[in-house]
């Protein structure tokens, strides 16, 4: 079989066409970083050695449009300190968030630190979209296994793509308006269904007012006419009318009698 020559671009070994280097965090720590520290052969020669913090991210060897992987050493910022010097010619790398454990809870194989590149001098730098993931071995594991203070780390550098925030906001606003309309229509339907299906209950145990008691008494058929206010009023009015009629009738009778007497006198 013919040996395939490795493809080089700006000093970086490249995979053949159709292949893509996309390892997981655990694979980077176990299969590459640990082997690099112990001197074991690597699965593939695709990760070069370079000092990431000595050059700006856009000047690093490799394709800026894709993810770039490097072996690098950590340089202490102070002689007796543990902080790394992450200043470049145009800016600096700033850590963001907490370090992430790589591996299972019982067996942690490494740590992952996320950094963002800022242009200018701290603390007044301007944030960019360049992101750096720094992988390192656990300190206790490194000291016990290798005996030496090896400062090797594995770095993944990439440019975060910008998203159109205005269009995204507009889409979110449209979705919110549509959701509000749907909820309003659902509420209206629920209210209509409640009105059509909900029975009407009367509370017979509540206290009645005086007016309501009078109305109920008038409308009650079991009450006698003497006790009913409406009937009593009607009977009183009828009695008044009857007395008036009797009075008028008696007056008429008297006039008729007087008329007859006068008539009889004339005949005599």
UniProtKB/Swiss-Prot annotation:
DNA-binding region: 109-166
Skewed-composition ranges (Basic and acidic residues): 180-190
Gene Ontology MF term list: DNA-binding transcription factor activity; transcription cis-regulatory region binding
Keyword Transcription: yes
Description of the deletion phenotype: No visible phenotype under normal growth conditions.
Cited Pfam families: NAM
Alphabetized PROSITE patterns for the sequence: NAC
Boundaries of every NAC domain copy: 15-160
Compartment annotation: Nucleus
Keywords: Activator, DNA-binding, Nucleus, Transcription, Transcription regulation
Entry-linked InterPro entries: NAC-dom (IPR003441), NAC_dom_sf (IPR036093)
GO cellular component terms listed in the entry, alphabetical order: nucleus
Region ranges (Disordered): 166-190
Primary location: nucleus
Primary role: Transcription activator of the mannan synthase CSLA9. Recognizes and binds to DNA-specific sequence of CSLA9 promoter.
Domain notes: The NAC domain includes a DNA binding domain and a dimerization domain.
Protein name from the UniProt record: NAC domain-containing protein 41
Organism for this UniProt entry: Arabidopsis thaliana
